[in-house]
A protein has these predicted regions:
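Bacterial N-terminal signal peptides
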Residues: 11-21
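Intrinsically disordered, low-complexity sequence elements enriched in Ser/Thr/Gly/Pro
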Residues: 1-3, 41, 73
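Sequence context surrounding c-type heme c attachment/ligation sites in exported
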Residues: 28-54, 59-62, 66, 71, ...
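Bacterial Sec-dependent signal peptides at the C-terminal "C-region" and cleavage site
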Residues: 19-31
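Eukaryotic low-complexity, charged/proline-rich intrinsically disordered regions
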Residues: 71-73, 77
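N-terminal Sec-pathway targeting helices
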Residues: 2-13
Length: 168
């Protein structure tokens, strides 16, 4: 039995160290000065941890039609932190939640990728969401405390600024 406990402890310690070394968590979006960085976030969600492998918002699998700007046809991916909030109806997304929305034309051509990333302390007045609008090639068109995003989403502030579905 002692060998089993020893093995479990060492295995757990090894996994923990790997998670720290490889930056699993929320630090991938920060630059060297600790500021939010759209290009670091892009690298994280396209190379280090490709968002196309993330689950989709439950009930929104595949393409679906939007009633809100900026796209008519959408695909919405969420990381595990966001999914836990959605499934367990936690009312507020946790630090590190990542929502990635692919926006398509009516002809299903990708034209924009919009991202909401929850970063504790980033913008308390805006529920700490960091907003980014990327072109499909990864160029950040808008980032940070984007007034256009906040002004649109403030209507659902009681749902942590998210239109897609209730998290309560």
């Amino acid at each position: 039995m002692n060998k089993l406990k020893f093995w479990v402890f060492n295995t757990s310690l090894f996994i923990f160290i790997l998670l720290i070394l490889y930056g699993i968590g929320t630090g991938q979006t920060l630059d060297k000065e600790g500021k939010m960085d759209a290009q670091a976030l892009w690298r994280y969600m396209t190379i280090e941890n490709p968002y196309q492998n993330y689950p989709t918002w439950p009930g929104k699998e595949g393409f679906y039609e939007s009633t809100m700007p900026p796209g008519n046809i959408l695909k919405l991916y969420v990381n595990d932190i966001a999914l836990e909030t959605i499934v367990n109806k936690k009312s507020v997304f946790s630090d590190g939640a990542l929502l990635i929305k692919e926006n398509y034309t009516d002809g299903r051509k990708l034209f924009l990728i919009t991202v909401m990333y929850k970063s504790k302390g980033f913008n308390p007045a805006g529920h700490d969401w960091y907003w980014v609008k990327y072109k499909p090639d990864g160029e950040a068109r808008l980032e940070g405390k984007v007034d256009a995003c906040i002004d649109c989403h403030v209507g659902v502030a009681n749902n942590d600024y998210v239109f897609t579905g209730s998290i309560k």
